[in-house]
Amino acid sequence: MSPSAFRSRSNIRSRSYTTNDLKFTFIYIMMMVSCLSQNVHNLQSDSDLSDTKLSGAVDLANKIYKNTGANKNNKNITVNASNLDLETANLNFNLSTSIVSNCSFGTTYSDYVNISQQIIFIYNYLEENKTTAVRVTVKSSNATEAFPTMFVARQQEGILSWQIPFEIGSSYSFWSVSRTLCPIDKSKKKTISKSQLIYITVSSMWEHNVHFTLTTNRVTDFELEHDKPRTFHLSVWQPTYFMYTFPENVSTILLKVTSASHICMTVSVQNIKCPVFDLETNVEFEGKHQTMTTQAAMFLEKDDFKEMNGFYVVFIVKPSNEVCEGYLQQTVIGPSNETDSKKTVTVEIKGTISGSQYLSAILGAIGFYLIFYVIAFIIGIVFAGCGLHKGLDELTQEEIGNERRSISSQPNESYGSICASTESSGDNILSPATSMNQIECSNSSDSLDESSIDFLHDASIEKEIVRTKTALFVSDLARKKRKKLAKSYRLYHWNLITIAIFYGLPVVQLVITYQRVLTSTGNQDLCYYNFACSHPLENYLSSFNNVFSNIGYIMLGLLFIVIVYRRDVLHKKILRKHGKLEKLYGIPQHFGLFYAMGLALFMEGIMSACYHVCPNYTNFQFDTSFMYIIACLNMLKIYQSRHPDINAKAHTAYFSMAVIIFIAVLGVVYGTNIFWILYALIHMLVTLVLTAQVYYMGRWNIDCNIFRRIWRLVITEGRKCTNPVYPSRFTLLLIGNIINWVFALYGAIKQPSDFATYLLAIFIGNLLLYCIFYIIMKLLYKEHLNWLVKIVICTSVITWAGSLYFFFQNLTSWSETPAGSRSGNRECILLDFYDHHDVWHFLSAISLFFSFMILLLLDDDLSHVRRDKIPVF
């Protein structure tokens, strides 16, 4: 079909050009000449375009321009592009430009273009006081990637171009596109013309006719209103954006986007300026943005948009759910099924809390924890003044005199009660050489310290006698010199201080860097906040409430250290006053582990706050590391209470904790099938080793003959398993082994995605089991719990139940994608400032504090009971 025949089909075309239009034609011809100079080999077969031919084309363009200039007074000049004598330039090319003027908004235009036929659509409208936008929707069903259909929209202040097929990446192509032209902001309406023109040029480089349709609409509801939800539809080929202007009395707002569809999309907030970055390929270059499936939210401040007092909200549907769901769903949406990707979205903008509410929430949290200081002070006065805590000071003078006479009348014995027990025992346990040395009890128990015990040549054999007795008492395992043990236990908190400094400082530096990157890039997928309740602190913290809610760990950790220090001071007074008498009564008091527990609680607050500066997949171990340490220290403290001489050294304990943290990191980063199998095997093996260590009180060795000894033990004493020598220890260890083996097998089979939480659950489960066992054994041995301990236990149980309820609300999850995590976001529930996870912080801090207090107060009823009457279990 010839160009003239093609034009004759249309009765809406005008061939009347204005002077300005002919100037544009001149520019367009020059552009075509430039293109022809590069692609002329497709049009002619003899040789390249010569200088003579190029100059001829340029002369032709100048001639057209001069002819139009000679008739400037004429408002309309008729020029037929197809009749231009292009042969003058020796070019085998005819270009026909058709104009469709006075186009109507809302009307669909359908036509064809090819290499020699282009069409210009002209829209004319009057700008009003209200900001409006123009949306252009085009479709070209038979366009190809080799010969796309090109669209160019020109306005007074900018130009926008795109093509069909509309390609996103290398896998997705679309034959329908809807684009919003950058609107003229109402602040500029005084400096621009009221009458606005839009030129939309449609062209193609294909020799065959390419069909297209074009529809242009004015978006009259382009501005979003405050506190009024807006529901609309969009799709992959239809990116959309709206404008919002801050009201005069609003300084901060919450932008909330919701959808029932799980189709992946991006929400972006950008400054009001052209061009608007509304494509999948460029949306990340401007403003703040986050991915979403069912919901998204952004906290925005007016001060961040001072220039225009508002912003654009851009919505872009992604072609696949790979980013949001974590799997790849490749789908090429063609002209027949573009509606398959439609997504219905509701956007709402509402105000946030004021600065006074910020202050009330902060002071309220601090005041709440100060109440614990007041209660602790009152209880301290009651215990000290009313004599509720009976210790050595409460013994009568007659009792003190009897005990001192008993001490002075005792014969010199080696290892305290060992000689007496061996003399009364008729069992010939020791070898003759050992018995001779053993009978020579030349030193009193007071003269024996850590070095004298550990370095005697028969010390190992004597430990075998003591620690393998069927009925053990605390006096049997509290024989090392107190000063040396105290120095050893003090290493726990001093080493922990060093660990905290060297571990904490790089963490602080890293999270500050995270915050700066988040602020500078605007990529809010970096951090897993609860965006529906995320209150920033200027540009320093994006979620200040999640950071500040850790104040409970810090304040209660310090309070626990103060309480321990007070008990330490009182105990030292008793030592100075009663001397050797203290060594006969109560559980041995060593406060090093208690100080370490308080410090660990304090550091948990610091590290959890650091994690919540930018919570994500790479730094979750910041939050859990000191949780592991707290669990380990609590179990060590329970064991130390009645096994003071055989507890783990500080460096050994912390090295074991470091190995645990290392395993946690491996599980998070490399959670493969091989890892889970190896972890399960290691877990079960370590459980067996610790079982033997606890059951035999450390009196066994791992060497090349270990398996031979185990086999002999099974052969000779296998039947005795139904009647174990140490029934209480056997029961605890049996239950512990069952629970730990279940944990290990569950991990290997189910392979939970959150390995760090899984590992933490193992430690909490073991700690809970040990605490329950210890309390039950106290009651079985007729030991009493005073009223304060009962209150603390009940309070701890209640707060732990509440804590776990809020913990499992799953507001966020770093094990999922950012969009998947964001789907669980919920609004604030406390003072319009704190969310469920903040309440977890509050309650878990209280729970840990009361758990520590249980261990501190649990054996106070034994302070006036002789150690040789306190059983070991």
PLM-predicted stretches and their roles:
Residues 21-37:
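Cleavable N-terminal signal peptides of Sec/SRP-targeted secreted and luminal proteins
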Residues 5, 18-19, 25, 52, ...:
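Ala/Thr-enriched low-complexity intrinsically disordered regions
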Residues 1-17:
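N-terminal secretory signal peptides that target proteins for export/translocation
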Residues 46, 51-69, 74-305, 310-312, ...:
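Non-catalytic, beta-strand-enriched accessory regions in extracellular/secretory proteins
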Residues 96, 105-109, 118, 123, ...:
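Long, hydrophobic alpha-helical transmembrane bundles and adjoining juxtamembrane helices/loops
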Residues 35-37, 42-45:
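Boundary at the C-terminal end of the N-terminal hydrophobic targeting segment
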Residues 13, 28-30, 78:
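Residues marking helix boundaries in flexible regions
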Residues 11, 20-23, 72:
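Intrinsically disordered, low-complexity polyampholyte segments enriched for Lys and acidic residues
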